[in-house]
Amino acid sequence: MRSRSRSRSRQRERRRSDSRARSRSERRTYQKPQHRRSVSRERKRERDRELHRERTSNRSSRRSREKDAVPRRRRTRSSPSRSSSSSSSDRSSSSRSPSRSRKSRPKSVERWPNDRYHENNDRRQNPFRGRAPEGSFINDPAEPSFRSQHRGRGSSNHQFKGDSKAVNARRNQRVLIGEEGVPEVWGKSPSRPETDDVELVKGSYIGPKKKKKKGKRKHKKSEKKSKKKSKKSKKKKSKQESSSSSSSSSSEDSSDESSSSSSSSSSDSEDESEEEDVWLEKTADGIKKPKKKKSSTSKKDKKSKKKKKKRKSEAEKSKKSSSSSASKSKNKESASHNDEDVGPSLRPGGSLNQKDFGKALLPGEGAAMAAYIAEGKRIPRRGEIGLTSDEIANFESVGYVMSGSRHRRMEAVRIRKENQLYSADEKRALAMFSKEERQKRENKILSQFKDMIHSKLQAKDKK
């Protein structure tokens, strides 16, 4: 970076010297003689000295800016424009205002008024030009940035010499924070109560959450049961009150015997309704009509009792008939289930085609299959080679199955090969039979051939 900046500064100096020579020649040719006379050699020397000092100050300011700036491309592009503008401003200022203070900075070329070039390029104020806002931790004096260290190569340390007290204070503050913490920002975690009574064994630990849930569930169930019981007790009390009121009214009207019978019947009906199913209770409730004030005559009481008895008998009959019909239907269903075979129905017309049969027996297969049959074991299929028959049977009992089409073809081959097997005696008998048949055929052919030759010889002799 230093070599680049030096080369650029040399190029700028050359340009400036060229521009000075041109400006002097132009002044000599185009400027008026009055102006030439006013400018003396001493003033020229002063201007040269001022220019030299301004150049040195500009270089130092540029270097400090380059250290602060993050994006390199923008800096490299904007630096020549700045240098050119500063050089032109130097010329204009040197030509126009010779009496200027040495420390005053030269003004740049006037730009378009709405152009915010300088505002955007002021890197110390703009956080988006590589410099973070002043309050952030990036500009912390205790944390010098990597780029400033890298570019300065030790020269950036002079920035923090004045702030050494602040840096030390910040360091001490960090140490305190690390030791004590910040309770205002991050509170301490709650201390766990030490339980010495519980001794945990490996694999026997059950989380406390599950126990809590179970306890909650039990508590809820007990609450629900208690609520249900309270509701039932309330209902019973209300029914008893109604029955007592009805019995008292009937006792006032009717005789003592009739009142006792009505109260007993009402209590019996309540017990029956509680024992019976829900739908019977509903029917009984539906049958009951809204209570009206009974007349003083005993005839109406007797009629109402008779009606109640009839309705009870009808309800009992309907219940019995429904239960009998349900039991009959259940018996029918069980009988039908017993008659039908459980499981998938067999395919109708599952005749075997030529595709289902394999090829003929290979040499040695017949003998092997005969040995399996003699031992009473199942014959393995070609897809099961490498496994013993016991292993295959175990696999099939567990549930391992071949693919359907392969299974069908293998079964067909197995059946055909089992049918092809013969015992040793049968083989001998077959061999003898085939030999006899062959000899008969051969003898027949030979006799026919002999007869033909004999007939031909006799025909020649006759001639």
From Swiss-Prot:
Observed effect of gene inactivation: Late embryonic to early larval lethal. RNAi-mediated knockdown in the wing imaginal discs causes a developmental delay of 1 to 2 days and results in viable adults with small crumpled wings possessing extra vein tissue. Larval imaginal discs show tissue overgrowth with loss of tissue architecture and formation of multilayered epithelia, characteristics of tumorigenesis; cells show increased invasiveness, loss of polarity, increased levels of R-loop-associated genome instability and increased levels of c-Jun N-terminal kinase-induced apoptosis.
Regions of compositional bias (Basic residues) in chain numbering: 1-14, 208-238, 289-312
MF (Gene Ontology): chromatin binding
One biological process term in Gene Ontology: mRNA splicing, via spliceosome
Biased composition (Basic and acidic residues): 15-29, 39-71, 107-125, 279-288, 330-340
UniProt modified residues of type Phosphothreonine: 195
Cysteines engaged in disulfide bonds, as pairs: none
Region (Disordered): 1-358
Keywords tagged on the record: Nucleus, Phosphoprotein, Tumor suppressor
GO CC annotations, alphabetized: catalytic step 2 spliceosome; nucleus
Bias kind Acidic residues: ranges: 268-278
A Pfam match: Nkap_C
Role this protein plays: Tumor suppressor involved in maintaining genome integrity. Influences gene expression and mRNA splicing.
UniProt name for this protein: NF-kappa-B-activating protein
